[in-house]
């Protein structure tokens, strides 16, 4: 859906503007938060009273009676003109108060109900929306250890949010006056830029709850190594060490291709209710947006469908769970063709080792072309796309890198998977220059060098410790040196 910005009034073309920087909260922010909290508690008390009264209409009538504003019917045939006039005045007062009480009842209802989540989002408030459910939903939820959350109010309480705040975070607008995310770009190896979209603190805290209590409890395939406890770029690389052929395939637009509807489907299959799945899928996704000025107002305009943001804590875990079937199919394909398969986020790696093949296959060449053709078929069938420019085939005798580590067969004392030599040489040269009092490269800091040393330590602890010790010594020397006046 494309939003329409008042076409009846001529205006200048929208101008793209940078996302504004966050400003520090004002001194009375705490007082405003407390006032909002008290107002919300009052709404919850009112909502409870309405439920106990039997509904909004019964509560309104009871309030009118308690205030002495409920007016009984009048027999106009026997009433005097004076009584008629007085009765009409009372009815006006009753009607005015009834409208005010109905507004109050609606405010209380909004504090405990979602109601609407924006254009293109189906939302059913009642709990009967699961009448046509996925098979064995309750059993799936129990098997995955998922908490049964049967209402928006229960979910909001678990997240530490009010229902109105939950609705605000989940509500989808094509054009919005505010955004729950902060975006910036970082350079990629090929010179292009990657956009990072990170949620603001309160939404990030809610997403972390979703990650811990929902996403991380969903099943993940053993071939997945990224963002999985106990696995890393090292475990991913070690699966391919000493191979004769390494094939790397990259998935294009990995996070943006996972829309909120795909996330909802994943959560439904995991055992969550319809409403809970809808709210959590919207809470974990956002549309890519561009900030524009329109008639003096800053607007955030959606440029595409709502999908996983690269920068949200939930995104990697959701893709791991969503790729369960993809990983199963690619693992089976790899096994049939004699390959080993692993996945680290959007990086798919296959390796073929002659020594691991059955004797009849050892004289055959690895079926790389067949593998690549069928990988593309499986990837597309599972809703993803292969990046046409990032497929690499590295044979024995050329440098084979997997998730940044070299996995070629190495000497007796060398790690099976190791940091490339040029990185080690770069760190060694940087330390040498600093010891000689020479300035580092532009933008180079001790913290960055320590990060490189820690990277080396992961694959070669002895070498990494030696580099870290030298950097610690340099840091101590720098802090002890007299500061120039």
UniProtKB/Swiss-Prot annotation:
PROSITE patterns the UniProt entry points to: RT_POL
Keyword tags: Antiviral defense, Magnesium, Metal-binding, Nucleotidyltransferase, RNA-directed DNA polymerase, Transferase, Transposable element
SUPFAM superfamilies in the record: DNA/RNA polymerases
Region Disordered: start-end pairs: 1-33
UniProt keyword Nucleus, yes or no: no
Enzyme class: transferase
Catalytic reaction list: DNA(n) + a 2'-deoxyribonucleoside 5'-triphosphate = DNA(n+1) + diphosphate
Residues that hold Mg(2+) according to the record: 250, 346-347
Similarity section: Belongs to the bacterial reverse transcriptase family.
Protein name: Retron Mx162 reverse transcriptase
Organism whose genome encodes this protein: Myxococcus xanthus
Taxonomic placement: Bacteria, Pseudomonadati, Myxococcota, Myxococcia, Myxococcales
């Amino acid at each position: 859906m494309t939003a329409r910005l008042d076409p009846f009034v001529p205006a200048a073309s929208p101008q793209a503007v940078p996302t504004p920087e966050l400003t520090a909260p004002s001194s009375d922010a705490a007082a405003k938060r407390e006032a909002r909290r008290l107002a919300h508690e009052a709404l919850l008390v009112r909502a409870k009273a309405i439920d106990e009264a039997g509904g909004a209409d019964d509560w309104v009538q009871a309030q009118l009676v308690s205030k002495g504003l409920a007016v009984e019917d009048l027999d106009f045939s026997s009433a005097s003109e004076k009584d008629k006039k007085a009765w009409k005045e009372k009815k006006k007062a009753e009607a005015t108060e009834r409208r005010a009480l109905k507004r109050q009842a609606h405010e209380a209802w909004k504090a405990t109900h979602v109601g609407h989540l924006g254009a293109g989002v189906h939302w059913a408030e009642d709990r009967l929306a699961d009448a046509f459910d996925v098979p064995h939903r309750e059993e799936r939820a129990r098997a995955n250890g998922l908490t049964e959350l049967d209402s928006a109010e229960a979910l909001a309480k678990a997240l530490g949010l009010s229902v109105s705040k939950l609705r605000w975070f989940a509500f989808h607008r094509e054009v919005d006056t505010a955004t729950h995310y902060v975006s910036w770009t970082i350079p990629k190896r090929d010179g292009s830029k990657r956009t990072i979209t990170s949620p603001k603190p309160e939404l990030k805290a809610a997403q972390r709850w979703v990650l811990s209590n929902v996403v991380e409890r969903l099943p993940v395939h053993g071939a997945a190594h990224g963002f999985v406890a106990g696995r890393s770029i090292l475990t991913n690389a070690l699966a391919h060490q000493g191979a004769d052929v390494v094939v790397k395939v990259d998935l294009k637009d990995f996070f943006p291709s996972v829309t909120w509807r795909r996330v909802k489907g994943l959560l439904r299959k995991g055992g969550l209710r319809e409403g809970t799945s809808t709210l959590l899928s919207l809470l974990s996704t956002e549309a890519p947006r561009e900030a524009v000025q329109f008639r003096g107002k800053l607007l955030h305009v959606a440029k595409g469908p709502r999908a996983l943001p690269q920068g949200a804590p939930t995104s990697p875990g959701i893709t791991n769970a969503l790729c369960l079937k993809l990983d199963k199919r690619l693992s089976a394909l790899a096994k049939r063709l004699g390959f080993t398969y692993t996945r680290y986020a959007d990086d798919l790696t296959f390796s073929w080792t002659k020594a691991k093949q059955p004797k009849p296959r050892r004289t055959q060449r690895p079926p790389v072309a067949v593998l690549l053709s069928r990988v593309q078929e499986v990837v597309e069938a599972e809703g993803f796309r292969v990046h046409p420019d990032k497929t690499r085939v590295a044979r024995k005798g050329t440098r084979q890198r997997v998730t940044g580590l070299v996995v070629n067969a190495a000497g007796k004392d060398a790690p099976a998977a190791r940091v490339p030599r040029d990185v080690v040489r770069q760190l060694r040269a940087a330390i040498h220059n600093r010891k000689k009092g020479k300035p580092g490269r532009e933008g180079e800091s001790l913290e960055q060098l320590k990060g490189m040393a820690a990277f080396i330590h992961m694959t070669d602890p002895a070498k990494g410790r030696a580099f870290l010790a030298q950097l610690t010594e340099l840091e101590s020397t720098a802090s002890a040196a007299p500061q120039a006046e």
